[in-house]
Swiss-Prot record:
InterPro entries: Cytochrome-c3_hydrogenase_C, NADH_UbQ_OxRdtase-like_20kDa, NiFe-Hase_small_C_sf, NiFe_Hase_small_N_sf, NiFe_hydrogenase_ssu, TAT_signal, TAT_signal_bac_arc. Its cofactor is [4Fe-4S] cluster; [3Fe-4S] cluster. Belongs to the [NiFe]/[NiFeSe] hydrogenase small subunit family. It is a peripheral membrane protein. This enzyme recycles the H(2) produced by nitrogenase to increase the production of ATP and to protect nitrogenase against inhibition or damage by O(2) under carbon- or phosphate-limited conditions. Predicted to be exported by the Tat system. The position of the signal peptide cleavage has been experimentally proven. It comes from the Bacteria. One of its GO terms (molecular function) is 4 iron, 4 sulfur cluster binding. This is Uptake hydrogenase small subunit. It catalyses: H2 + A = AH2. It comes from Azotobacter vinelandii. Keywords: 3Fe-4S, 4Fe-4S, Cell membrane, Iron, Iron-sulfur, Membrane, Metal-binding, Oxidoreductase, Signal.
Length: 358
């Protein structure tokens, strides 16, 4: 197996000082939600561990995961792609095309057998022997199985690879399936979202490269560090929910005052993601902050769960302190009555309080 440069080797070759390198390690620790004590461990890993070869495949998808990934700010995607990893194949970002690109894929698989990470964006269709998605003249499902067999680990980018997403929505004429239905003998890290948050994507890669292991996963295979809590739990509109202050109609007084969007379809109470903490566009905002309810794009089968603007009505009661593992997949899948009751009771109390005022 050929030797790869370490991340620190690459940074020194680029003229980056030791001080800047240590500063980068501190910022990386902060971006991962780790304390300052982890900065030396990250620095040691960057100095001693070789850059990991990554092969990035594309199946049925819209490329929104790649679009999100290249906009990462912490760390910058240029540092990830050019220094931290060795992105040896990605037909969307690489300069080579056609036979040259496929030759690069085969060469990396041969040189780094059992050492490379497979990243998958999109999913494979099974109908008509996979002919609904062709890459390099062959069905994508063949390429996926071929590259996965010698991978050290697999990352499923986005809801397409993790759950199936819109391609697998009813009636699913191509029989698109998530990649875990095809790859059954490799560890898979699911990073759902349509698309996932940029810093979540780079954070997962950084963790794997730094600590040499998969991040802690929940029962559905998602990193707990980013998918351990509901968006509802950390939402800045949560106090309005508890106070029974809701947007009833778009552009009503409640909407203008920034009240809770639960009654106009927000799926935050049943969606596990880091949107309300990490946010989007370098931490600028997220859909709820922009005035639109969460559509639950990181959850399994969200396209087939009714209108984006339909109020949830079957959510079982569970507290803010609960996480995905404690609640379990069954509860997270069956969604609404207690929250609906809570909303009704708090609204009635508000009306009563108004009536008591002189």
């Amino acid at each position: 197996m050929s030797r790869l440069e370490t991340f620190y080797d690459v940074m020194r070759r680029q003229g980056i000082t030791r001080r800047s390198f240590l500063k980068y390690c501190s910022l990386t620790a902060a971006a991962l939600g780790l304390g300052p004590a982890f900065a030396p461990r990250i620095a040691h890993a960057m100095e001693t561990k070789p850059r990991t070869p990554v092969l990035w495949l594309h199946g049925l998808e819209c490329t929104c995961c790649s679009e999100s990934f290249i906009r990462s700010a912490h760390p910058l995607v240029k540092d990830v792609v050019l220094s931290m990893i060795s992105l040896d194949y990605d037909d969307t970002l690489m300069a080579a095309a056609g036979h040259q690109a496929e030759a690069a894929l085969e060469e990396t698989m041969r040189k780094y057998k059992g050492e490379y990470i497979l990243a998958v964006e999109g999913n494979p269709p099974l109908n008509e022997d996979g002919m609904f998605c062709i890459v390099g003249g062959k069905p994508f499902i063949e390429q996926l199985r071929h590259v996965a067999k010698d991978a050290k680990a697999v990352i499923a980018w986005g809801s397409c690879a993790s759950w199936g997403c819109v391609q697998a929505a009813r009636p699913n004429p191509t029989q698109a399936v998530p990649i875990h239905k095809v790859i059954t003998d490799k560890p898979i890290v699911k990073v759902p979202g349509c698309p996932p948050i940029a810093e979540v994507m780079t954070g997962v890669i950084t963790y794997m490269l730094t600590f040499g292991k998969l991040p802690e996963l929940d029962r559905q295979g998602r990193p707990k560090m980013f998918y351990g809590q509901r968006i509802h739990d950390k939402c800045y509109r949560r106090p309005h929910f508890d106070a029974g202050q809701f947007v009833e109609h778009w552009d009503d007084e409640g909407a203008r005052k920034g009240y809770c969007l639960y009654k106009v379809g927000c799926k935050g109470p049943t969606s596990y993601n880091a949107c309300s903490t990490v946010r989007w566009n370098e931490g600028t905002s997220f859909p709820i902050q922009a005035g639109h309810g969460c559509i639950g794009c990181s959850e399994d089968g969200f396209w087939d769960k009714g209108s984006f603007y339909e109020r949830l009505t079957t959510i079982p009661q569970f507290g803010i302190e609960k996480n995905a593992d404690e609640i379990g997949a069954a509860v997270a899948g069956g969604v609404g009555a207690a929250i609906a009751a809570h909303a009704a009771v708090t609204a009635i109390k508000r009306l009563q309080n108004k009536g008591d005022r002189p």
